[in-house]
A protein has these predicted regions:
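Short, well-ordered coil/turn segments that N-cap beta-strands
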Residues: 7-11, 35-37, 65-67, 82-84, ...
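Glycine-rich phosphate-binding active-site loops on the catalytic face of alpha/beta enzymes
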Residues: 13, 88-100, 129-141, 166-194
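A short beta-strand-loop structural module common to alpha/beta enzyme folds
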Residues: 38-46
Length: 194
């Protein structure tokens, strides 16, 4: 179904345990079996301690399947757990020192405008997620930014850009995003329901 890429289009799984019909760790294992580019552990409602506990378990599963695990928001936990990939909101990334950034080999940043994309690249981001591209239940009531936005972001930065928001297991959608210059897409709902 996934196998890391469609042609060269890369798929990153984004977690949301509230969307799972089965145990979350079982769902992570199912996701790893379809071989995504990476798994972003994005559980925004957890406390730092709860996130640390869950991150250890998810990293173990990802390591078993040799799928990169990217920790979200809690960068100090990533350092503590020796996870070298992290995904951050731009406001958190802005305050990281150069020394703190050096602790990671990959830093992804969520952006919602061309200006944010340029700033994130200047600050040293490895890749960006830009969105939301399509209508999604996660952003109910908010109109999607669309493919034109994605194209503009991809044109203005030289680092890899992944579309996020309403992305499905849909080759036509992937082709459209690839034509905009995106290297891949991030799937949440579809990944939590496979």
């Amino acid at each position: 179904m996934c196998n890391r890429s469609y042609h060269e289009f890369k798929i990153i799984a984004v977690s949301n345990r509230k969307l799972c019909d089965r145990s979350f760790l079982e769902q992570i294992e199912r996701v790893c079996k379809i071989d995504p580019e990476a798994v972003i552990l994005r559980e925004k409602d957890l406390t730092e301690e709860e996130y640390r506990t869950l991150a250890k378990e998810v990293m173990e599963i990802c390591n078993h399947y040799q799928i990169p695990c990217i920790l979200h928001r809690f960068w100090k936990i990533a350092v503590e757990l020796e996870c070298t990939a992290v995904h951050l909101p731009l406001p958190i990334f802005r305050v990281l020192s150069d020394e703190e950034k050096k602790k990671f080999t990959k830093i992804g940043i969520s952006v919602h405008s061309v200006e944010e994309a340029k700033e994130a690249e200047q600050l040293g981001a490895s890749y960006l997620t830009a969105g939301h591209i399509y209508a999604t239940d996660c952003k109910k009531g908010l109109p999607p930014r669309g493919l034109e936005f994605l194209k503009e972001v991809c044109r203005e930065v030289s680092i890899p850009v992944y579309g996020i928001g309403g992305i499905k297991f849909d080759e036509e959608q992937w082709n459209d995003m690839e034509k905009c210059g995106a290297v891949g897409g991030c799937i949440m709902s579809g990944m939590m329901e496979i």
